[in-house]
Amino acid sequence: ALAYAYEELDKLAIAGDSRQMGTTLTLLYFHSNGCTAAHIGDSRIYHLRPSSHTILYKSRDHSLVYDLYQAGELTYEEMKTFPQKNVITRAMIAGDRSHPKPDVIHISDIQPGDYFYICSDGMLEQMEDEELLDVFSANVRDEEKRQMLISETSDNKDNHSAYIVHIKEVS
């Protein structure tokens, strides 16, 4: 899937239609041994277990602000208002032959009732992890959870998109 995405981006660059086009990537691949998750950029993947009110996995942003936070140069609160908070340090760019590699993780501990949440950074602009857990732990239908997430992001200035994957059964 990643090779195909790079191939299509490169075709756009060759055709001259790229206009410095770049994108993030988030990918979940479910298989008999669990799930393989991969990402490039600042779109995020979460694996949540509402039954224990736990985030089991949260992808690491490939962004300047996150790198500075990890290095101890910014606090968590300073990250939110840092002027260059939207600078991405790894992305898929049309015509960029270096083809940055994604972070890849295998997740085998998947249980019925778990959720995977894939979202762009705009979905998280005003939402903390604890609030996200509260939404997914709420005793309401998935459609209502979706509406709760939409209402939390209605004032966001960044683009926002998301996918919710609810694990019903595991074989």
Where are these regions (language model features)?
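PP2C/PPM-type serine/threonine phosphatase catalytic domain
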Residues: A1-S171
